[in-house]
Amino acid sequence: HISTGDILRAAVKNQTPLGVKAKGFMDAGELVPDDLIIDLMKERIEQPDTEKGVILDGFPRTTTQAVALDTMLAELKRPLNAALLIDVDFEVIVKRLTSRRMCKECGHIGSVADAACPACGGEMYQRDDDNEATVRNRLDVYEKSTAPLIDYYRGCDLLVSIDGDRDVDVVYADVKQALGL
């Protein structure tokens, strides 16, 4: 599992050149420019631990990124098996993300109801980009930049749509089934 968000947050925390460039976009809820993300993902996808397959989380987010991914995978002679759309009502997304909390110690994702991390007992905090204004801006950016990927992957006969408004265990089971796991 490769999460562009995790990679970018680590780059910001470590103040790498990419992290410094990306921070302003992330804090505003904007997409990090395609060229930066494509370079980052190309470097990561070429690592030996991805040879048997990988789940990409947060990439691609634009049609330009999708075309770049197609090129990368063709060069590596690897197929793209599916593009999952976990479909959730925008107001549900706002509620979920603004109540999301993360453990400072182990990175466990929890909710505002968790006073301490259920995994390790560490302190829970709200990520800077999980405030309502930033979440709503991210949804606007999604509509403009990422939603066109639905038609792109439908046209490639790779789109698998999953109803994300259900219990997490049911959604997870559907994701596993869609991926053949």
Tell what function each PLM region has.
Residues 57, 76-100, 111-116, 162:
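Conserved phosphate-donor/acceptor-positioning beta-strand/loop module used by diverse small-molecule
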Residues 17-21, 100-103, 179-180:
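Short, hinge-like loop/turn segments at secondary-structure boundaries
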Residues 2-78, 89-92, 127, 134:
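ATP-dependent small-molecule kinase phosphotransfer cores
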Residues 68-72, 96, 119, 174:
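Alpha-helical scaffold elements adjacent to nucleotide-binding pockets in ATP/GTP-utilizing enzyme cores
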Residues 123, 127-181:
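NTP-dependent small-molecule kinase module
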Residues 94-136:
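Cys/His-rich short segments
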Residues 72-78, 102-108, 152-154:
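Arginine/glycine-rich "motif VI" loop of SF2 helicases in the C-terminal RecA-like domain
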